[in-house]
Amino acid sequence: MTESLAAVVLGIVEGATEFLPVSSTGHLILVGHLIGFTGEKADSFDVIIQLGAILAVVCLYWRRFWWLVSPKPHHAFSGIRGLWMLFLTSLPAGLIGLVARKSIKAYLFNPWSVALALSVGAVMIFLVEQRKTRDRYYSLDEMTPGLALGIGCFQCLSLWPGFSRSAATIMGGMLLGAKRSLAAEYSFIGAVPLMFAATLYDFYKSAHLFSADDLGVLGIGFVVSFVSALIAVKAFIVLVQRITLRPFAWYRLALAAAVFFFWPK
């Protein structure tokens, strides 16, 4: 498979799965191994094309992001207060990721670790959906700093490739009293600062792996990731208001089982 075609495939996978509770990184690792696109350069490529998915969320929620940087507060979740909550959500995983980045790439970027994370995350989704916690937060404007920090702590689980940042933050929000649709919406918006910082940091650290000839491939992955993320996020916004997360948990278990039983030893 040519690098350009690999970029298209991986861009679709990244955009379609980044904001679903199924783990985009886990899917990229599995698909990368299947198409022979592996190694340190491939791992960094997977992280860098996240920028396309990030931009998709910014476009979909552009008004919310504008309110965050606008000097005049428009809602409770805007201006300095909104930025402060996003900072609190990004802080725990950001600090741990900064310290453990090399170890995570060295020991957890493999199909077996991904399959285990998919399984653990699926079990947790089932448990969270059985929760008896009463919803206390229904909109972004009802978010509190404590809720934002709590979701950020759950986000640390996403440092395990295959667990899913989206799953971790949505489950965390639900356990802390957020309505499922609010937890999903905040998961999208709250992802942007951490993902943007992680992508830029990874590119800075791995820039020596890429040459000018790779810019075209990176561009393809970026554009395809952007388009597929736009479609996926819009669809998920509708779905999460109508169904639970259980179908995604069953999918995770099925994919994990396929890896455990059929992946070459």
Swiss-Prot record:
Pfam short name (any one): BacA
Subcellular location: Cell inner membrane
UniProt membrane topology term: Multi-pass membrane protein
Catalytic activity: di-trans,octa-cis-undecaprenyl diphosphate + H2O = di-trans,octa-cis-undecaprenyl phosphate + phosphate + H(+)
Tagged with keyword Ubl conjugation: no
Molecular function via GO: undecaprenyl-diphosphatase activity
HAMAP family in the record: Undec_diphosphatase
Note: Bacitracin is thought to be involved in the inhibition of peptidoglycan synthesis by sequestering undecaprenyl diphosphate, thereby reducing the pool of lipid carrier available.
GO cellular component: plasma membrane
Protein name per its UniProtKB record: Undecaprenyl-diphosphatase
Entry-linked PANTHER family: UNDECAPRENYL-DIPHOSPHATASE
One record GO biological process: regulation of cell shape
Functional note: Catalyzes the dephosphorylation of undecaprenyl diphosphate (UPP). Confers resistance to bacitracin.
Transmembrane stretches, start-end: 19-39, 42-62, 80-100, 108-128, 143-163, 181-201, 220-240, 243-263
Family to which the UniProt record says this protein belongs: Belongs to the UppP family.
